[in-house]
């Protein structure tokens, strides 16, 4: 009998060791795969400690890295300034940065890690609407507010239940951009007939196009679409060339619209090209070519040609000193986002307090203008229409449209 007991104990011990080894390697595998922690683990928000921890969930590599890198620059500059001035309530701001690689799934994972593992008190980013939509679900579950500098999709801050308590934006909505494009093309450029050409694979572009169609008072001669990642637009552009119209309205990101503009100009199409804030990056000019990036107009939340507040000139000077280039819209919006979070962090004890304070932010003056957060967590502020010639911003006009 003792013999059989020894055998049984030996087998049980062997199985236990095997299970321990398997569990060890499984944990390594999950870490290697970037497995996210449980997003429900911190649903009541995070406490503010010795520092105010700001997570950065940004597109630093991948298809739209130009947006993310500009926003990262604006974020770092703002944090440096605030910390040099003594911080907030005597506490320094601390950055924790994650690269979402311009991928929506990675944006969700980045926010989860920032909220659960790093215990940040607020998150700035992502830059693009699809990534924000994915990351916002995490903020809603963890109680860590997300402030996107440039995510414009209308439903980012609201859902079927109403306003999302922990999701905010610093820029205007897609529908507002569509209204601005419709009014500016018809009234300012006297474009009574247009071609509408937009990215049908992008919710951002489709949202702007839909609102443009609702608001435009002129005739849309033809409506055509392209898809993110396309490289050859000759077929559609050749058809446009033979039509009678005054301008091309082209909702989309610079990754495609810069190439389309080059191919259009190469075909001899010299009509005005109008687009949303997705045009607002030097990469647009790089893809189109300086000469081709002329007679181009786009919506923007910022321009170095217009001082939207008394803070504008100081920001431009500081940014150029830090990065040896002029700031674009994305850098300016991200810079303002940090200052908004800093303002909302005053007297706050938790991330939930920061969210509550952001929701009641009024008459905040940033480099992108004066703004108040409305009931849907969108800023009430003016938009600009910027003109680009030979690859450079040559003018900008403030456009006020009823929202």
Task: Tell me the role of every PLM-derived stretch.
Residues 322-331, 342-393:
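Segments of small-molecule ligand-sensing domains
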Residues 107, 168-193, 206, 232-234, ...:
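Hydrophobic alpha-helical segments within soluble ligand-binding/sensing domains
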Residues 139, 208-299:
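Extracellular/periplasmic bilobed ligand-binding domains
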Residues 38-43, 67-71, 85-158, 226-230, ...:
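Beta-alpha junction/loop-to-helix N-cap segments that form part of ligand/metal-binding clefts
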Residues 45-74, 98-105, 127-128, 197-206, ...:
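Extracytoplasmic "Venus flytrap"
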Residues 60, 164-225, 247:
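An alpha-beta-alpha
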Residues 29-32:
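C-terminal motif of bacterial Sec signal peptides marking the signal peptidase cleavage site
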